[in-house]
Amino acid sequence: CSDFARQPLGEVDPERVYEVDYLLAEANQNLVSRWGHSMLRLVICKPGRPRGPDCRLDLDQSLVLSYRAFVNDVQLSSWDGLVGVYPSRLFVLPLGQVIDEYTKTELRSLASVPLKLNREEIENLVRQAAEMHWSYDGNYWFLSNNCAVESLKLLRSGTANPKLNDLDSIMPNGLLAVLDGRGLADTSVLDDPREALRLGYRFDSYRDRYQAMFDVLKKQLPVKQTKVEDWLALDAEQRKPWFDQADLRTSAALLLLEQAGLRRQLLLAQDEVKQRYLNAAALKDGSVDKADATLKQMLANSGFLSRPAELLDTTGYGLPQREERVHLEKVSSERQAQLLRLSTNLDKEVRALLEPSRARQIAAVEANVKHIGEHLRALHKAAGGLQL
């Protein structure tokens, strides 16, 4: 979990789980995600709501089971992933966090397809997932023991469904088709794209929304760019002269685009800082020592988020007993508070590692967001809009 302010220890009541979905993030060109990413979504009803289709609208209750390589170093090596160096951990994440991660940051769509499981299979799967999250460490191989294979193992062991027994190594973007072919997944929910979006069976990449906003901009202003990517590739200063020419609707579109531009700059900065960190660490030139020490403390302290058994000094098996949970809540809260402090320190230290040109670009986009916001409020006021 990337939010170190969130309560680290949670509970899931299997009785409140309405359905389990196969959640697929579409592929992109990065080596570690060019086959998509397989996850399972627990569709959980809010307290007091009877199990039924309406639970699908309780998006804030849904949890995602996501097998990922637990990387205890800043560098994600594709080679290490191919040879199984990374521990495989079952992360339990809020659905909203996963939607933002894929649709807004990585610009990848998500499909959430119901699995045809009976009540006993659903409840057993939830219990098995809890045990796997609690203490599982496997080896993560991008090719042969990846998220699809791990998800399939969890489905197989959790449901004991014989239709899963003879499935072997497979890629994420092929597993859904196989599950559908064996009558275990209902892909018909994706047939009507608009209805799929409305009912939470699909979460679209923000790329199409950004392009739609850019089309609004192009209708009013004679900009030369035709694709939103080209517009966002401009320097912030090159976009700025257009702002004061925009009407109310176009200004609203510009604000969303500039916020997307800021997200893009932060992603670029993240990659640049990572490369600088790795190069400086290799050269031992001392320029990243402070950030390095903080980051290592964070990595050492964050393992419990994906494997809570680390917090108990015991070699037992199964889920913790009631008295152990009291100890867990205390220790996990202390560890979480430490991570929050370290995260704040790291943010300051990493910003100092930015190249001056990148730092200027981020500052310029932040200024653009502020400028458009003020322009939008002025237009709104001039049009007689309600002032809050």
Go through each PLM region and give its residues.
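Glycine-rich catalytic cores of cysteine/serine-nucleophile enzymes that process amide/ester linkages
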Residues: 16-107, 351-358, 362
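N-terminal accessory/precursor segments of enzymes
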Residues: 75-148
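Low-complexity, highly charged intrinsically disordered N-terminal segments
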Residues: 1-14
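Activation targets extended, charge/polar-rich intrinsically disordered C-terminal tails
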Residues: 1-2, 113, 128-388
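Secondary-structure boundary elements
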Residues: 45-49, 120, 156-164
